[in-house]
Amino acid sequence: MAEGQVLVLDGRSHLLGRLAAIVAKQVLLGRKVVVVRCEGINISGNFYRNKLKYLAFLRKRMNTNPSRGPYHFRAPSRIFWRTVRGMLPHKTKRGQAALERLKVLDGIPPPYDKKKRMVVPAALKVVRLKPTRKFAYLGRLAHEVGWKYQAVTATLEEKRKEKAKIHYRKKKQLLRLRKQAEKNVEKKICKFTEVLKTNGLLV
């Protein structure tokens, strides 16, 4: 991958810790990483246990002045961001610079809806988790601990998927028309094609 290129990852169906570890390493190496669809990230273990863990984390606060921290993020993207932060030396200049190279998003807002999204096989649930094992969705966990935008994100995702379907249909139609056009003119241009092939201009 080119040095200045942005790596766009689709968080859906990836395990939280494994994905965070890989992302942390990449940002430390100097790559810019964007993680979309954070609400679709999975956590191993059943939902109830994960919720109890998060509720226990919500109780951790500074007794005399809770506004001083620790801060408890509710959005799935911020929960993932904090997980990555825990894997970085974020109190050093190097760690801070690495964290600035990471961008996390709920859903797939523009311009990332038009960009090619990658997956990380080493962090995929289907690869890493036995089919019988229980797992939880980060989006549901976030919603139950105070994230207010689950419905909004879901609606926007439905709209995006509909647009993508229309775009794909148009693309297929154009490809079909192009093939047909090529077939139609094949006989007319065959002699020119032969000349181009003999001169090595057409493979």
Swiss-Prot record:
Associated with ribosomes but is not required for canonical ribosome function and has extra-ribosomal functions. Component of the GAIT (gamma interferon-activated inhibitor of translation) complex which mediates interferon-gamma-induced transcript-selective translation inhibition in inflammation processes. Upon interferon-gamma activation and subsequent phosphorylation dissociates from the ribosome and assembles into the GAIT complex which binds to stem loop-containing GAIT elements in the 3'-UTR of diverse inflammatory mRNAs (such as ceruplasmin) and suppresses their translation. One of its GO terms (cellular component) is cytosolic large ribosomal subunit. Belongs to the universal ribosomal protein uL13 family. It comes from Rattus norvegicus (Rat). The modification Citrulline is found at residues 59, 140. Its main location: cytoplasm. CDD domains: Ribosomal_L13. It is found in: Cytoplasm. The modification Phosphoserine is found at residue 77. One of its GO terms (biological process) is cellular response to gamma radiation. It comes from the Eukaryota. GO terms for molecular function: mRNA binding; structural constituent of ribosome. The modification N-acetylalanine is found at residue 2. Keywords: Acetylation, Citrullination, Cytoplasm, Phosphoprotein, Ribonucleoprotein, Ribosomal protein, Translation regulation. The modification N6-acetyllysine is found at residue 191. Component of the 60S ribosome. Component of the GAIT complex. Interacts with EIF4G1. This is Large ribosomal subunit protein uL13. Transmembrane segments: none annotated. Phosphorylation at Ser-77 upon interferon-gamma treatment in macrophages involves a DAPK1-DAPK3 kinase cascade and is causing release from the ribosome, association with the GAIT complex and subsequent involvement in transcript-selective translation inhibition.
